[in-house]
């Protein structure tokens, strides 16, 4: 499971590092097997409020949207190397 916000962030990263051919592979081979949660106005607003209220500048809107979505769906484990997910109480893989 992922969100459309993560897809946007991933596409930008893949395009920047690997080019358009990699974007095509990502879109055709990886995206179809993902469960995508499309973020609505309420989740976006809740995540944005966390970003604005946070005392640190390294907290991204995409991460906050992920936290909010995971909590709403009861997801407890994240595939991530981002330490912030562990700080938020999620189980991170790889450990």
Regions found by a protein language model. Name each.
Residues 2, 59-60, 82, 94-95:
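Histidine- and aromatic-rich ligand-binding microenvironments
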Residues 9, 63, 82:
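Acidic active-site catalytic centers that drive phospho-/nucleotidyl reactions
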Residues 1-56, 68, 87-92:
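PIN-domain endoribonuclease scaffold, especially VapC-family toxins
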Residues 60-76:
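Acidic, metal-associated active-site segment
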């Amino acid at each position: 499971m992922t969100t459309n916000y993560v897809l946007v962030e991933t596409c930008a990263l893949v395009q920047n590092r690997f080019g358009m051919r990699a974007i095509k592979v990502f879109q055709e081979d990886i995206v179809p097997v993902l469960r995508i949660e499309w973020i609505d106005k309420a989740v976006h607003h809740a995540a944005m409020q966390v970003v604005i209220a946070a005392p640190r500048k390294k907290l991204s809107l995409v991460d906050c949207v992920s936290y909010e979505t995971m909590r709403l769906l009861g997801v407890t484990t994240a595939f991530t190397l981002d330490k912030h997910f562990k700080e938020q109480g999620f189980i991170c893989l790889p450990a």
